Amino acid sequence: MRGFRPLLSLLLPLSACFPLLDRRGPTDIGDIGARMNWAQLAEGHPPNSVQNPQPQALLVVAREQQASHREHTGFRLGRQDGSSEAAGFLPADSEKASGPLGTLAEELSSYSRRKGGFSFRFGR
């Protein structure tokens, strides 16, 4: 019994430094409470705080923004000479095929190889 008291007096202050974690298991795979460190728990941040958004939610938001951006990209180039809207995106036989990256660069910089130079748009 005498050897138990010094050990208890050492472990009791340690239990005050490290709070007990939630004994329930994680509710889903992306549970943030399972990955929190002791410093965040000591500061009092709840496990599902706004400071630590779930990565799956961020991925869904990013995909939605990319999808909505793709819907509007064809209408930014202004008037096109071709009969269809997609004619401006397809390279002619004499032009080098640049792919989606080159098309995006042309759209962002207002440079058109088909027209032979820069075209400036006012208002943006």
Swiss-Prot record:
Alphabetic keyword roster: Amidation, Neuropeptide, Secreted, Signal
Chief site of localization: secreted
Signal peptide from the UniProt entry: 1-17
UniProt propeptide residues: 18-79
Modified residues (Phenylalanine amide): F122
Single GO BP term: positive regulation of blood pressure
Pfam families for this protein: RFamide_26RFa
Subunit organization: Ligand for the G-protein coupled receptor QRFPR/GPR103.
Protein's UniProt name: Orexigenic neuropeptide QRFP
UniProt source species: Mus musculus (Mouse)
Name of encoding gene: Qrfp
